[in-house]
Amino acid sequence: MMGTSRCVILLFALLLWAANAAPPEIHTTRPNVPEEIKRPNSTEIETPAVKQLETPSIFLLTTLEVAEADVDSTLETMKDRNKKNSAKLSKIGNNMKSLLSVFSVFGGFLSLLSVVTTTSDLQVISDMFTGVNRKLDQINDKLDKLDNSVELQGLLTNYIPWQYSVKNGIEKLIETYKKMVEETDMNKRRLMAENFILFFENNQIESNINNLIKLTTTTDAVHQNMLFNELLDEAGCDIIRLTRIYMHVRRIFYQGTQLVLAYNSFKQMDPPEMKKYLNALIFIRNMYQSRVWHCKETTIAQSKKDIKDIVKTNAKFGITTVLRKINSELSRKYPWYSWSIVTVKKMLANQRNSTLGNQFYEMEAVGPHGSNFVVIWQGFKEHSQCEDIQKANTIAVLTICKSCHQSHVFTPSNMLNKNTCPNNQYPQVKAFIDRREPFRDEIQRKKSDVFWVAAGFKAPGNPCNHGCNGHGECKVVPYTDQFQCFCHGNYEGKMCQKKIQMKRDISKLISDLQTGYKNAFNVPSLTNILIQGENLAKQLKKMIQRIDNQFELTHILVKYISDLQKLDYILKISFNYSKKKITVDAFSRRMKAFLSLNPVDFIFQQLSNAILAEGFTDIQGKDFFNTFKRMIASNRDACTAPYGNEATILLERLSRLDLTAAESILAYYSFESNYLNPANMKRMLENAKQLVRDSKRRMRSYARYWERTSCPPLNVTHLTQTGCGALLSFEGMKVKLSCDGGRAAVPQNIECVNVNGNLQWSATPKCESSWSRWSKWSACASTCGNATQSRRRRCLGQSESEKCIGPSKQVRKCFVEDCCQEKYGKFKCDNNKCISLSRVCDGNDDCRNAEDESKSRCKYLRSGDRIALRNMAYSQEWLSVQYTDAVQADLYYGRAYLNHCIKGDHVTSSEWNSCAGQSLLIYGNYENGKIGKAIRFGDKIAMYYRKTNYHYRWFICYPTYCMTYTCPKKAGSFTFGPNGGCDEYEFYIINYNDKLSRDPVKPGDVITLANNRGSVKGNGYNRNININDCTVKRAQDDRIECNANAWQIFIK
């Protein structure tokens, strides 16, 4: 938009002064010099012509001067355009930033500045804006070409986040300008402004810019150093890198300031305080200047170090290449000097003691070449001719190698030497050398083998005699007649001759007028009203049409109708101009004709009477605004949000009447001031000042009067009547109160009453606390067993429990179902004991009544059970014992072998009887074989066969074979352990698949019977059973080989 664009234009004019040392400007007294001094060819000495590099400082200075000239040219172009059109807003002085940003604050006459700016003006601004930024880009591009080795992005890593934020903002702003140039519709331009405002705020651009300033100019807490200073430290005395860093950071600062100005102008806020941004630019300028000056003062010491480094890193190259690199590096890094580099056998004996040697030094036997270097320097702008040689303050006389080509010379064109001034061509040179003591004789002896270089041709006089006009500090570059001015903060120019100042004319008065309005009505920002850009005259007409049937208001309108019509006329022609319905000439002519017939003082006096009820028959409190508030309250509930909205709109319009009319008249003054002589201009400026003073006084009066004729703002927490803010109530207003959230309003009604001349509410309303309804009961805290459930209620009020009596929570017991159920993993005993379901049938009497281990419930092996054992290797064979009545009674043993009386893979009920020899009774060692007790894997057991009560035998394996034999004398009477005396009859019953198992043995389990000699093994049909170590000593993986030792158990 116009406001922002011109703010940006002025910003160039305000800020480019900071670039007068960016990089520092160097000025010299430069004598006339021939364009080129021809040098004779030499067979003894290589003297390649060294072209003086264009210095970065000179290039950057030139570019910035062009950029500043573009700004001035653009301003002049716009002035010329305005002259052709008679008058235009942009003619008001050079301080367009203050003027336009102020005009943009209020929408009564000027909403967004794009409204009053022609497309052609926007085009000029847009072209200039992008053009100058393009020039700044070209600076960086040029620096890139001068030094491709500088990794700027790596060096400026900490700047990258802020840099991209600013860069994106600038691109958005340029895009906005371009669209505005093409768009003529006022409302669409406003939308573009709003879009930029949202982009600026959402991306926190101003915060990023402030962070950037802080990052650059504030000392780091950890390193105790500022980032910008650290960047300069990284660059050392490399002038190219120093300048690149400075220009890059300066460009980010500059564009960031552009964005802030544009944002404030688009949003119609007061222009930001520029001091912060100017100080930041001054800061980096001064740091940059100081660093460059330090480099100038230490150039000679730095150059010696550079030569050593170059010779060391280029040891593999010839001396010519090394000298070329030295000359190139010194000329690049220290461009304020011209450099001559010479390799010699030696200097003349007394050369070092000569008074003519203050601008050269010798470095002896440097590097692997063992060469002696003589380095001579002088100011790069110093030029002389051979006849001026006696003015030199330095002459280096050197002994060279005549034919060995070991001596080399690199001299710039502005430095005299033997080749450019041979003795036979310039007798003055010979005479000058001959007269110089103490090495005259030595020169005469070695006339043909010496080479000389003369330097230090400074113009007479002090190059700082101008003193930077008293507005800065002047410093002379060592060994030159060049100087550099360090300007004070508010001065600029080559010799600090320009003072930075802003014109304080009508634009300042408009700013004061806006500030007065904001202070009077405590308005922080007018953005919303601005973006609406509403026509105040039309709004007043709508209000009049709505209530013209009301007697009181009609009375006031009739009384002041003519004065309101005059204000309406001013607003009408102002808006017509803003919408380009009339030309600027027509606006000026109509305003001039109107004001010639209607004195300004009288117009505003009548407006004041209407607003303040100060007319002859007016009554305080019965003015236009208070009467209108009564009309609204009669149609709507008093103090409700709709009432407040409508009353606020009227308040805003009335409060801006004075401001809008004054702005319009000041705009007219500013147009006319371009064509007045100094005397009339001074008189008009005084009128403008008086207009502003009177308007500010009246606006303060309006605010005080409306405050006096209104009760204080009705701001009560939770009160639903939110429409009675400051200045929106009136005497006699009655308000029915209510609160939100179920709270009770106390009292229920209040009134705005007069108490001793002051309006106040008849009571102080409040919303008292009360309990809300109880919530529903919560679910039981548990899914089974005894639990609790609760419900709550809230204290509706400001201080919670302090205002409400009684508990906020209730708790009661609840029961869902018994937790001791199988679905919850539990088992309930008959004695009501509850155990885990996993403990049922585990062989332990957990219920203490054997209920959980009953035979009907638990099918596992018990002591006293009859069992049969099927061999796993011979699946049809069963463990069998032999004993019959025919055997002699005194025969105590019987055979143990495999048999297949049982025909299948399990025992049928009849086979338990018919195959009695293949079933054994088993006893466990628990409670010494107590009948009915569970037998677990790992328990000791004993087995016996009983034919009759008198014929029984116990199963035994000894020593390696198994049989039946008598140890105990009767069945069921077996004593385990050492005291029993029948150890060979005891076996461990082991889970064949899990030796560590301690579970009860169940029908169908595969077992191993083992004693201390081994485990029981079947050997095939009708073969005796024996014992071996299989499955006892072997690993688990050997189970397949021990299948004959595995037995499947069956229980009757």
Curated annotation (Swiss-Prot):
Domain of life assignment: Eukaryota
GO MF, any single term: toxin activity
Cysteine disulfide partners in this protein: C464-C474, C468-C485, C487-C496, C711-C752, C739-C767, C780-C814, C784-C820, C795-C804, C829-C847, C841-C858
Coiled coil: 130-194
GO cellular component: extracellular region
Tissue: Expressed by the salivary gland.
Major localisation: secreted
Domain Sushi: start-end pairs: 709-769
Gene3D superfamilies the record matches: Low-density Lipoprotein Receptor, Thrombospondin type-1 (TSP1) repeat
Keywords of this entry: Coiled coil, Disulfide bond, EGF-like domain, Glycoprotein, Secreted, Signal, Sushi, Toxin
InterPro entries found in the cross-reference section: EGF-like_dom, LDL_receptor-like_sf, LDLR_class-A_CS, LDrepeatLR_classA_rpt, SE-CTX-like, Sushi_SCR_CCP_dom, TSP1_rpt, TSP1_rpt_sf
Sequence ranges assigned to domain EGF-like in this UniProt record: 460-497
Glycan-modified residues: N41, N353, N576, N715, N786
Propeptide: 22-29
Subcellular location: Secreted
Sequence ranges assigned to domain TSP type-1 in this UniProt record: 768-821
Annotated signal sequence range: 1-21
Assembly and interaction partners: Monomer.
Annotated PANTHER family: RAPUNZEL 5, RICIN B-TYPE LECTIN DOMAIN-CONTAINING PROTEIN
This protein's name: SE-cephalotoxin
Species for this entry: Acanthosepion esculentum
